[in-house]
Amino acid sequence: MKMEEMKAQSFDHVSLEEWKKTAEASLKGKSLDKLHTETYEQLTLKPLYLKADLEHVEEEQFPGVPAYTRGFYKGGYVEQPLKTAHRLQAHSTTDLQAKLSAAIEAGQDALSFSIEEQARMTFRECSELLASPYPLYINTKAHFLAFSAFLLKADAAELQGVVGTDLLSHFATKGLVPDEQALALHVEALTEMKQRYPKVKTIVIDTVPYHLAGANAIQEIAIALSEAVFYIEYLKEKGWTPLEAVQLFSFHFATGSQFFMEVAKLRAFRKLWTALCESYEIEGEAVKVTIGAETSEFTLSKLDRHVNILRTGSEAFAAMLGGVEYLQVTPFDQFNGTTSALAERVAKNIPLILQSESHLTKVVDPAGGSYFIESLTNELAQAAWEKFLQIEESGGLLSVLKAGTLQQELAQVLEQRIVDLAVRKKSMIGTNIYADLNETFFSEYEGMEVLLADRPVSSYKELLNQVSEERTLAELHVRDSGEPVIPVKSQRLAEPFEQLRERAVGIQASGKTIEAGLICLGKLKDFKPRADYVTGVLSTGGISVQVSNECHSVEEALQFVQNTQFPYYCICGKDEAYTEFGPNLMAELKQGQPAIQVDLAGKLPEGEQAEWLAAGLDGHVFAGQNLLDKLSSLLALWEGGATHE
């Protein structure tokens, strides 16, 4: 086709009904509903979104306009630059100083480090760190009172950024809700910090602990809003105005693996936050609260750890499309032992690549106008607001934590996520599918244990008076005081599969070889699909396989078992081969080797199933099976008895 002819071409308008008809034809008789996706938020994602999906969405047309769904600033990152705040890990303050200097030279523009690892930091060492002109982004967690005391005693007049903690979420992970004593000390510290460092945000509303406990996007947004209400109302009782409280707020989220949901989560939060501010008559610049995000630890795996680079890259991308101000990327080998220099470098470079090569900071709200994202944002906002009101009607976040209802709801979502991974409804490359049996495992980094003083203090000023040059954060740590509740427990999604692999490594360390046999019936082209499937399933549990030659008779199958002497075998073939060989194969196998366990790949018709079971069949390996349960029972074969050496 010539260029002039190409220019003359046009695309015919296609109606929705025509599209549906064509789509249904491609599904070969299946309903179009097969293309719909149910999310953990109980929302339904459609395969196609049109302008009609935005008919009931009342949205502003531009960023920087209330309700700020498209961003707080008209110029996006051009007006309010992204701050990369890679959280550095270091064994000592000296090491931390060196890493901070290197990070700044490499392009990092906010200082952040794991304060738990720096509990041995002295006041003198802290003062030296504060000499940097760059903003801080530090979640102090258990060390807020001690670290803020250091800051107040130091000479750091230009201090800015975020240095704070979330008393509610931090205590919840410990199985506590703060009592009046803990809250009063916290307010004293906030008051002193506000007077001394007005540019520092000291109330970090951190939803990450809930995210790590399995929370969906609706729950995360609702919890963030409910925590904000708690802090505003409590500080009002202490004489603060809502505006004074909000000016100290910084929200911190984790962005997970559901890319578009995470983008919509951040956009929906801004919309609802604006609505909440309106209810407190807060407007203007005060509404433009600081929002930070970290890539999710929940989605990371020790297994095939380099895949984590893809996960964190996608999650960082979602965070930037969502318009966060601070961004932290987790190193890909965070849970494989001491973080490598390569992982640190990759984590620091991902935001730089998204800025300098993808130019995300040059486009204001790239997600704006997408029928899908705008519609999803609206649905998410409506559902999250309803959930927020439900929490408030139940007495607020403290009440639902005390009652245990929130923890129960989080546990239900977490359980569903794990089950979906176990039955391969969801895939995690290298973890529940395409596992690499040859990769090397590393022990989880435990760091240097520091004994915290856990001191009781009657007032914050008493703590301030105890600061001296060589006093450490650990020595100034204040005892947590609160009412016991069910803990908000953190768990990574991959942990159950990691535990299976660690069991396998332990078995091998005892001198045993974990190997199973596949009895393959018929020709290669007939048994290969099921043999490959079983091989993949067993590898996720750390079990390697030896595949038999083509077995065209019961005698050949028996000979393979006799030669290998494994404790476990799986018969693989087409359904026709199962019918041809019949239960007699099973009976002969068990007669010769009664101690072995034998499964069948796939499922049998009900009529044949009973005969095979009667002949000695132990079970099946099939799609949709709970792999965690199956593999756990199989590993017990090697843990409990002699195995092939």
Regions found by a protein language model. Give the residues of each.
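Catalytic alpha/beta active-site cores
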Residues: 1-258, 289, 330, 470, ...
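Catalytic-core signal marking the mid-to-C-terminal active-site face
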Residues: 2, 36, 349, 355-513, ...
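Structural signal for hydrophobic packing residues in well-ordered secondary-structure cores
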Residues: 23, 27-31, 104, 130-134, ...
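Ordered, soluble secondary-structure elements with a strong preference for glycine-centered loop motifs
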Residues: 94, 263-264, 340-341, 528-532
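Active-site capping/gating regions of soluble enzymes
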Residues: 250-444, 597, 619-628
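A general structural motif
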Residues: 309-310, 548-554
